[in-house]
Regions:
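Extreme N-terminus of proteins, especially the signal/transit-peptide cleavage junction
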Residues: 1-4, 299-300
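Short acidic active-site motifs
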Residues: 72, 215, 268
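Structural motif detector for alpha-helix initiation sites
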Residues: 30, 95, 216, 285-288
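Short, charged/small-residue-rich alpha-helical element at the C-terminal edge
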Residues: 225-299, 303
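ABC transporter nucleotide-binding domains
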Residues: 3-8, 13-206, 210-212
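ABC transporter nucleotide-binding domain
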Residues: 172-261
Length: 303
């Protein structure tokens, strides 16, 4: 991955008195899958709309492939495949007719047979009228229209919304394939397991502020692990005072079982245990969801 595909610098957006984006700084690398995490109202959709000049920020600068969306909105839109989060498809088109219409409007379009193959993979019947489709099938049409052109960037706002688990997985497979072919993927989601499966890096947004950005694996690895140790005999003298990343949560009365938190690397912790008669060691590694919830707790511990 080289170069910058998307750059936001000190971006602010107000809706009346509501400060939706609060000085957002963000860089997305060319060719990566960037997962943008946050619940409804955090600022995910507002960010994407600003990047496409569908709405305009009050302050700050945005560049997509080096272009300013406010000065070159048509050029930016031509280089981006976009799936909106509030997708609304109406009218007398069939799904096939709609996709053919979009294909005529776009340059550098994908082979029609390739689109048919994608439709088959996500189990979409193309000859029904859009107005008669379920919301899940409308979502599939929306995904396909974002794939009509071969573009360097895709912006997908909640791409698996309304889909069943099998179709969600297939959509993620398609997204990964596009990235493998060099496309930069920026996708927002509130479904943590999806982001964990495919994102190279993750940004967590809370109330319009980017509170964390990191490699997905790095974010999980540096989180707090929970370890439960069972000893073959009582170990009343177990001492972790020399390790600043260990916090003892619970010790059984017979001193045969300990529950601890281990922050960051595990090497020193494991070496300390080598001096004791360990029967069993269980380590719970947090999911991305648990990491995410840590960032979303306020000062009272409430989410």
């Amino acid at each position: 991955m080289t170069g910058t595909a998307i750059q936001l610098t000190k971006v602010h957006k107000y809706y009346g008195k509501v400060h939706a984006l609060r000085g957002l700084d963000l860089e997305v690398h060319q060719g990566e899958i960037f997962g943008f995490l946050g619940p409804n109202g955090a600022g995910k959709t507002t960010t994407i709309r600003c990047m496409l000049d569908l709405i305009r920020p009050n302050h700050g600068s945005i560049r997509v492939l080096g272009l300013d969306p406010q000065k070159s909105p048509t050029a930016v839109k031509a280089k981006v495949g976009y799936l909106p989060g509030d997708l609304k498809l109406e009218g007398d088109f069939t799904a096939r007719g709609f996709l053919q219409h979009i294909r005529r409007l776009r340059r550098n379009h994908r082979d029609w047979d390739d689109l048919l193959d994608l439709a088959e993979r996500i189990d979409l019947t193309l000859d029904q009228k859009i107005e008669n489709l379920s919301q899940g099938n409308k979502q599939k049409v929306g995904l396909l229209q974002s794939l009509v052109s071969k573009v360097p960037v895709m912006m997908l706002d909640e791409p698996t919304l309304g889909l069943d688990p099998l179709m969600k997985q297939e959509v993620l497979n398609i997204v990964r394939e596009e990235a493998d072919n060099g496309t930069t993927i920026f996708f927002s989601s509130h479904i943590l397991s999806e982001v964990q499966k495919i994102a190279d890096r993750v940004g967590i947004i809370r109330k319009g502020i980017l509170v964390e950005i990191a490699q997905t694996d790095e974010l999980i690895n540096r989180a707090i692990n929970c370890a439960t140790i069972q000893f073959k005999e009582s170990v009343p003298d177990l001492d972790f005072n020399h390790l600043s990343n260990i916090k003892v949560l619970r010790i059984n009365d017979d001193h045969r079982s300990y529950t601890l938190e281990v922050a960051g690397e595990m090497d020193s912790f494991i070496k300390t245990l080598a001096d004791y008669p360990v029967r069993d060691l269980a380590i719970h590694r947090p999911s991305l969801e648990e990491v995410f919830l840590k960032y979303y707790k306020d000062d009272t511990g409430e989410v």
